[in-house]
């Protein structure tokens, strides 16, 4: 997400609480000429012509640092990260909420991670997604970050850094129970090893 008025960028890593940051930034910097695109988009920034608003800048919701600096190399960038286990729990709640998964967590987690390992990012889905971008799944958080200033969701420091008021949106219910086993934790730790190491999670 790019805020041209403030010359800043926010890297929204999926399932880290970034939607709340986006809303807070949109509340502070109201600009009708830019819009975060929730649908899959190839480029980080695309300009389209609309009947009602004229030119509109569509910004890719989950663009990485490296994608965004191509358009705004001098901006200051921020990113929010989350503990890998909590992030996976959020992925599960999101997919259940979207009715793309109905499998119990302890079976689903293996399908998901082994799907990532073997290049099948949709292996964790029970239904085919329609206009829901799930291509981000296999990516580790560090693949998004680049030179952005890192804040942890657990520390809640990003609000002050961006000078925005804390809000919480898109809080998903726990419809199906989430039960971890030692084996499933180990599997996630192995797959997201670089996130644990570089983001100092244990």
Located regions from the model:
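Membrane-interface amphipathic segments in extracytoplasmic regions
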Residues: 1-202
């Amino acid at each position: 997400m790019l805020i041209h008025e403030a010359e800043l960028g926010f890297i929204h890593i999926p399932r880290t609480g970034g939607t709340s940051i986006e809303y807070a930034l949109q509340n502070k910097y109201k600009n009708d000429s830019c819009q975060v695109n929730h649908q899959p988009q190839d480029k980080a920034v695309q300009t389209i012509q609309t009947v009602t608003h004229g030119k509109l800048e569509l910004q890719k919701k989950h663009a990485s640092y490296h994608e965004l600096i191509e358009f705004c190399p001098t901006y200051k960038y921020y990113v929010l990260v989350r503990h890998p286990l909590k992030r996976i729990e959020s992925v599960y709640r999101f997919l259940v909420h979207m009715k793309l998964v109905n499998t119990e967590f302890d079976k689903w987690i293996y399908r998901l991670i082994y799907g990532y390992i073997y290049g099948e990012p949709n292996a964790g889905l029970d239904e085919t997604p329609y206009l829901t971008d799930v291509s981000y799944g296999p990516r580790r958080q560090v693949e998004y970050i680049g030179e952005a200033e890192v804040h942890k969701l657990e520390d809640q420091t990003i609000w002050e850094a961006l000078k925005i008021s804390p809000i919480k949106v898109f809080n998903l219910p726990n419809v199906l129970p989430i039960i971890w086993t030692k084996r499933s934790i180990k599997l996630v730790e192995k797959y997201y090893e670089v996130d644990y190491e570089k983001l100092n999670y244990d």
